């Protein structure tokens, strides 16, 4: 009997294993979020590249019209050169957009620790504008506090601290030890007649049974200090658990209001994109018919491109924010 030190040590080891497992799960969660963010960045850059290439096609069409008008005397040579410069500029923007897309693919491939990004690509999911009602932070927290690995790891360590106190207290109890054994021996002396092996086996056979009792009286307050330190550690871990819970609630609050802001921005950017696209189409017709100059056309085009870029950024930001809220509720990160 050792004051239940052995079973408490076993229980402590199991709790430490559980805490380490939750630490591993926390690391997996962090990787999942990083991969999701990198994946959404790829989708964002891919759509920007498509917009850039569409703009190249529009500029080429405008160039063809200007060249035709120039042959008919309806456009000046300067307007043709302006149209050519615009095509070259848009082609350069498209190349830059393609490069950004490839860099985003490279980042994700590195996160996945692929040997090379060559041949690596992603499948674009079908993303619909589903503005569902967001769960309140309090409701999300009630689910997250039961499932998040960081909280569970802190709880297991707090339980382990209680076992540590029991282990330290075990030195206050008497220690009862038991031992037993059996044995025999054989010897051979040169020049003397020796008994046979079988005879010695039986004659020299012995066995013993031993009990020892150790009663602690005074050990220079070593046990008291160990118990005191174990209790201090338990208090510190209890505070750490509460701090982890508070930090989790703050994270959820921030994620919630970020999602609300992203939803509002996405809705307004959709409206702005529709308006700027209609304005650009109208300006393109005016420019093609000579009713608008290059400056007006470029201004309308730049405004449209900016609103499209803002809309795409708002779209994937909103998608990421809502997925993070679901993730806190224990929903796996998917884009199906």
Spans of features found by a protein language model:
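Periplasmic alpha-helical coiled-coil/stalk elements that build and connect Gram-negative outer-membrane
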Residues: 30-143, 258, 262, 304
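Small/polar, glycine/serine/threonine/aspartate-rich low-complexity segments that form flexible
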Residues: 8-9, 14, 124-133, 166, ...
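Metallo-beta-lactamase
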Residues: 97, 149, 314
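Long amphipathic alpha-helical coiled-coil segments
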Residues: 107-115, 321-335
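Structural signature of outer-membrane beta-barrel domains
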Residues: 1-2, 183-187, 218, 328
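Amphipathic alpha-helical coiled-coil segments
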Residues: 27, 31-50, 68, 104, ...
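Amphipathic, heptad-repeat alpha-helical/coiled-coil signature enriched at exported N-termini
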Residues: 2-38, 46-59, 77, 81-84, ...
């Amino acid at each position: 009997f050792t004051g239940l030190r052995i079973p408490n040590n076993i229980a402590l080891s199991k709790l430490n294993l559980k805490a380490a497992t939750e630490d591993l799960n926390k690391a997996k969660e962090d990787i999942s979020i990083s991969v999701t963010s990198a994946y959404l960045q790829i989708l964002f850059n891919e759509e920007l590249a498509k917009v850039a290439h569409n703009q190249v096609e529009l500029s080429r069409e405008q160039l063809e019209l200007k060249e035709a008008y120039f042959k008919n005397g309806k456009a000046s040579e300067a307007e043709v050169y302006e149209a050519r410069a615009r095509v070259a500029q848009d082609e350069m923007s498209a190349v830059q957009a393609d490069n950004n897309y490839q860099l985003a693919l490279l980042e994700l491939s590195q996160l996945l620790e692929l040997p090379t990004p060559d041949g690596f690509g992603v499948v674009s999911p079908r993303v619909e504008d589903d503005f569902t009602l967001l769960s309140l932070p309090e409701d999300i927290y009630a689910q997250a506090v039961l499932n998040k690995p960081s909280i569970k790891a802190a709880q297991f360590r707090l339980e382990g601290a209680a076992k540590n106190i029991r282990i330290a207290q075990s030195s206050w109890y008497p220690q009862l030890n038991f031992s037993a054994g059996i044995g025999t021996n054989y010897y051979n002396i040169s020049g003397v007649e020796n008994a046979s092996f079988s005879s010695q086996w039986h004659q020299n056979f012995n066995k013993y049974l031993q009990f020892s009792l150790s009663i602690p009286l005074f050990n220079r307050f070593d046990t008291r200090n160990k118990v005191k330190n174990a209790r201090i550690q338990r208090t510190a871990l209890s505070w750490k658990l509460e701090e982890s819970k508070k930090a989790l609630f703050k994270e959820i609050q921030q994620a919630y209001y970020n999602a609300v802001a992203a939803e509002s921005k996405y809705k307004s950017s959709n409206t702005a994109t529709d308006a700027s696209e209609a304005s650009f189409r109208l300006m393109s017709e005016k420019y093609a018919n000579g009713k608008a100059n290059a400056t007006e056309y470029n201004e309308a085009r730049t405004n449209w491109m900016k609103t499209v870029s803002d809309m795409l950024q708002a779209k994937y930001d909103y998608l990421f924010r809502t997925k993070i809220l679901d993730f806190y509720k224990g929903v796996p990160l998917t884009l199906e």
